[in-house]
């Protein structure tokens, strides 16, 4: 699906909790709409309000509607996390040029690895019979 028109997404958002309008058999393809809504800040806010209402009142809604809202909520939070990750500044540092810390090769790192073998039977208490 290419970018859905905003008015279509709004109409979808208004009716996606109505199984008579969007039947259960269409549930597998709804994730495309969820992703498109997550990209629009205004629609995301409306969707979040609607999903929070449904998820706070689980007993008042069918399991299908709760599942739809859960998946939409996941799409919204994932999009928010992706946006937050875009603000990260990644800096690569070449540790070979640092003078106060010697560069350790892979073998030197492995030399610091301590492996111990323990007998689990020493730590298991026998139950009194």
Curated annotation (Swiss-Prot):
A cellular component term, taken from the record's GO annotations: nucleolus
Gene label: SWM2
First-listed, main subcellular location of the protein, grouped into a coarse class: nucleus
Pfam families per record: Swm2 (PF17083)
Family the entry assigns: Belongs to the SWM2 family.
InterPro entries recorded: Swm2
Protein name, per record: Nucleolar protein SWM2
Cell compartments where the protein resides: Nucleus, Nucleolus
Record keywords, A-Z: Nucleus
Species the sequence originates in: Lachancea thermotolerans (strain ATCC 56472 / CBS 6340 / NRRL Y-8284) (Yeast)
